[in-house]
Amino acid sequence: MVLKRVRCYYLIITIRLKMKVFTNKNLSIEQYGFINTFPNQNYILSYLHPYNPYSSLIVCYDVGLGKTYAAACLAHMYLDSGFKVLYLSNSLNSIDNFSNEYEKVVLDSRLNSLKKNITIKSFSKFYNCEKRGESDNVDYGLIILDEVHNLRESAYRYKLIKNKLDTMNNSKILVITATPMIDSKDELDSILSLTKETSRIIFSENKIDIKISYVGQEINGETLFLSEMKGQQLKEYLKVVNEENDTVYSSSRQASISLSNKFNPSIPLDEQSSKINAFINSIKEGELTVLFSFYVKRGIDFTSSVLESIGYKKWNSNKKQKRTYAVIDGRTNKKNVEEILTSFNSIANIKGDNIHILLGSSVLSESITLYRVKHLHIISPFWNYGQIKQSIGRAIRIGSHEGLEDKSMKVYLHAAHYDKEGKDIDIWKIAYDKNKDIIKRLEELKIDNEFSNDSLLDIPKIDNEMVIKINEWVWDFRNCFDTNKFKISWCKIYEDKAIGYNLENNTKIMGNIPSYIRINRPIPGGYTIWRSCIDKKLRISFIDGEVNKFSKRGKLISNVNTSEIAKDLNCENNIESIINTLKEQNRYFDKQIEYDL
């Protein structure tokens, strides 16, 4: 067994982002009340804010890091500001997922009224409408292109959609993909050209602390789960290899999975399918297992019949059964998909009491989350790492292994062979070689976008008075007060001159003081004692309508006539008693700038 961290499986890089300065006071994202957004999501929301000047952003965050939720939050910001939103994706799972995520964002009665201003279409539907001249001509404030790697599948569709985007000059564009390059390092260029400007492209480091171990032995640089074909399967495989003249090896790939569409109990399993025989032998009781197969009949259908031959039953929502399996493929309707996923992901299924084994085709490989999976099998090799990454990403996400003491998963990249040779091994090698070129291109991007934190942010020295550090933020309030060496004024405080530096994503914002930071000032309706952040001295002020007993900057507490104040406050005639009385009334501030997390 080869033990690796998930970040070793494919290149995951963090690009340090060049500093952007946001100056509009309305740019705060706190006002929207988003729950549980992470720094990588907040960067998207801040950068592509409706009132920021930037018109596009390409997000290449890895699977499982909340790209769709961030897109839903961003859509809400535009809808709340009166704009319309267009969401495009070619994955029905992605479309449903985005709609569900938006419902999590809006926690009030405005959901339906806001949601009607979101147009949701597949790339194919959008393409067909444009092709027929049925453009809606809506002036969208935001266009979201999700799973954009699917847009490259059709050159004609890509060109028409790109031409349409080029005419939508007033729209901002958010491009989302976990796999910007699948088959070629040049594919990134087609994504970059979808936007109207030189777009910022951002990657993220995967901080999901789940161990992945690849089971098998290393062949051509990749850890493969080998199984040797024999008997009738090997005869069938060699026959189709000799007859096959196409370059995609469709027949031999299917033959390498199984001999036929259904298990024949009169023939030993290892002579019908070396892969499924190895799969069956790897099954562990009490540990959830997922199997992906590109081919339905020789993959999923054959595996289903094998499972039933050893006592497994197909999951039925109306029956309580033990040792069950479920299937999600192109034949599974939407309602059944939802029921299967709900049952599989339930905490009650942590040991497979509802569904032990889930079989899935390519429809399961995008925009679906699977929880607490311990074993993941890919029995049909892919031509590229993008599809591998998408499949594994279904089960490795933020919170995907909560409830398990051992947060780890085993991955089995199946390869059938004879004498360590075969089309499976060839295809895995092609994918591996492609990935080396893609990694090189990504490394070049990393170098092109590498910046120094110090040179970009120029963060002032923290003094815990006018410059304070709170978590990943440093806040500078030195320009917020109308003061010089001769005057100190509490009445003119310029909150829009506060500067915030985010140390995690290298952003700089102005005028967006979060709600947990307070700049204290005299309270109307009486006396207030406050310590000025300018000279650190205690001052007392009195405000009652238009009445000001002292100057606007207050009066030093050491210089006041205590008898008059003590009489007004009905306390003893000394400074200590006056201070204690105002403390009891919550009208005493020892620090002008306070924060409460």
Curated annotation (Swiss-Prot):
Residues 48-198 form the Helicase ATP-binding domain. ATP binds at residues 61-68. The keyword ATP-binding applies. Its EC number is 3.6.4.-. This is Uncharacterized killer plasmid pGKL-2 helicase. The presence of the two linear plasmids, termed pGKL1 and pGKL2, in strains of Kluyveromyces lactis confers the killer phenotype to the host cell, by promoting the secretion of a toxin able to inhibit the growth of sensitive strains. It is an enzyme of class 3 (hydrolase). One of its GO terms (molecular function) is helicase activity. The lineage of its organism: Eukaryota, Fungi, Dikarya, Ascomycota, Saccharomycotina. Residues 275-467 form the Helicase C-terminal domain. SUPFAM superfamilies: P-loop containing nucleoside triphosphate hydrolases. A motif (DEVH box) lies at residues 146-149. InterPro entries: Helicase/UvrB_N (IPR006935), Helicase_ATP-bd (IPR014001), Helicase_C-like (IPR001650), P-loop_NTPase (IPR027417), SNF2_RAD54_helicase_repair (IPR050496). The keyword Nucleotide-binding applies. Belongs to the helicase family.
